């Protein structure tokens, strides 16, 4: 049986806690008591952050999405590929010239925030003529961000640049290579290869264990799956 007096005593002895919030713009503020009204007067503003998850353990390799394409998809394939050279990585992978060359990555889909494209035509003189075809789609790693509305543009770029005679590869990266890029690639597998969400997520994690779409993105992927009528 619950002892109300004991619970009341424990509650009175509890220490006041401070909760830190970060909004989509990167503004950080602290609330002294989460049970109190979250008003402007109850907030303590902190230093701003970048507005995205910062990767504290940089890695500079692109990870291939290992998948066997179903024969039914190959039979109705408009891209003429027998394998898909899709890669995922962090922003560091997008700067690794040697790795990009070794993996025949000719195109990069940049879905991060504030990340420069290094191997552009304008920079070819300082990169020994090495040129990458880029597409920038800015996506915030925020649970309230509508990522579904970005899918079509991402799919179009991937379809336009993947495969070919040389079976060129495409790297999809964000800042940390964890949430945004994973969500885009999962949605692509769902849409183009008819692979259910759960299996698509498993495929991404087997290629790059760090992959973890935020909860808001996962909810949107569930909605997207229902729209695809699996």
From Swiss-Prot:
The reply on keyword Hydrolase is yes
Q: Name one Pfam family in it.
A: DSPc
GO biological process annotation, one example: regulation of JNK cascade
Record SUPFAM superfamilies = (Phosphotyrosine protein) phosphatases II (SSF52799)
Which keywords does this chain's UniProt record carry?
Answer: Hydrolase, Protein phosphatase
Gene Ontology terms for molecular function: JUN kinase phosphatase activity; protein serine/threonine phosphatase activity; protein tyrosine phosphatase activity
Hydrolase among keywords:
yes
Q: Where is the active site?
A: 174
The catalysed reaction is: O-phospho-L-tyrosyl-[protein] + H2O = L-tyrosyl-[protein] + phosphate; O-phospho-L-seryl-[protein] + H2O = L-seryl-[protein] + phosphate; O-phospho-L-threonyl-[protein] + H2O = L-threonyl-[protein] + phosphate
Alphabetical list of CDD domains matching this protein: DSP (cd14498)
Q: Where is the Tyrosine-protein phosphatase domain?
A: 78-230
Fetch the InterPro entries from UniProt: Dual-sp_phosphatase_cat-dom, Prot-tyrosine_phosphatase-like, Tyr_Pase_AS, Tyr_Pase_dom, TYR_PHOSPHATASE_DUAL_dom
Task: Give the superkingdom in one word.
Answer: Eukaryota
The entry's cellular-component GO terms read:
cytoplasm
What are the disulfide bonds? Answer: none
What job does this protein perform?
Has a dual specificity toward Ser/Thr and Tyr-containing proteins.
Give the UniProt family note: Belongs to the protein-tyrosine phosphatase family. Non-receptor class dual specificity subfamily.
The molecule here is called Probable dual specificity protein phosphatase DDB_G0283417
What species is this protein from?
Dictyostelium discoideum
